[in-house]
Amino acid sequence: MDVILLERVAKLGQMGEVVSVKEGYARNFLLPQKKALRANEMNLAAFENQKAQLEATNLETRKEAEAMGEKLAGQQFVIIRSASDSGALYGSVTIRDAAEAATAEGFTVDRKQVALIAPIKDLGIHTVMVILHPEVEVEIELNVARSPEEAELQASGKSIQDLAAEEEAQAEFEIAELFDDIGAAGMDDDDDDAPAPAQADPSSEESSEED
């Protein structure tokens, strides 16, 4: 199907271009989202009449998106999820979760603007693209952790593997200290059980002096 693009569409074309697309793509996405019109004589004439207005509207919305993008770009949002010791989530983080996390921090982000190839299924910091306008894209970070404390550690640059290694090392240190304490206590008990040194009999000493 031939359509007239009413705005820039990634990997397809710029505003005003007539492009050929699959009918399903046009019917299910481009036309209902008002990103394109059927390329017929009437619509071509209508587009030419509205072209100046469409370009002005596009410029205004792009400026708004750029202003928001300057604030949103590089922001990190924390999402708390349950996960195994290996870092695998019990569930996943979706585009809806990403949009809600950003919105909760005061940014107006619709889930349709979040470009996530597949749901996130592991702890860690994940980079996600947000498309604010056909010509404005920014990256944000999702800090997926099991607790706010873990999120802070991840934000400082530590991975889930680093955290697990530190916890294991701490556990081994505590066990070693426990055995040291037990060993020290055993030595004290041995000292208490040792027989007292024999004391000289005063009477025998007196007898020796008389002789």
Swiss-Prot record:
- Asked whether the UniProt record includes Glycoprotein among its keywords, one would answer no
Q: Which SUPFAM superfamilies match?
A: L9 N-domain-like, Ribosomal protein L9 C-domain
User: Keywords on this record?
Assistant: Ribonucleoprotein, Ribosomal protein, RNA-binding, rRNA-binding
Pfam families assigned to the protein according to its UniProt record, in alphabetical order: Ribosomal_L9_C (PF03948), Ribosomal_L9_N (PF01281)
**Its domain of life?**
Bacteria
PROSITE patterns the UniProt entry points to: RIBOSOMAL_L9
Q: Choose any GO biological process term that the UniProt entry carries and state it.
A: translation
Which cysteine pairs are covalently linked by disulfides here? none
Gene3D superfamilies assigned to the protein according to its UniProt record, in alphabetical order = Ribosomal protein L9, C-terminal domain, Ribosomal protein L9, N-terminal domain
Q: GO terms for molecular function, please?
A: rRNA binding; structural constituent of ribosome
Spell out the residue ranges making up region: Disordered: 180-211
GO CC annotations, alphabetized: ribonucleoprotein complex; ribosome
Q: Which NCBIfam families match?
A: L9
Described purpose of this protein according to its UniProt entry: Binds to the 23S rRNA.
- Tell me which family the UniProt entry assigns to this protein: Belongs to the bacterial ribosomal protein bL9 family.
Q: What is this protein called?
A: Large ribosomal subunit protein bL9
Gene from which this protein is expressed? rplI
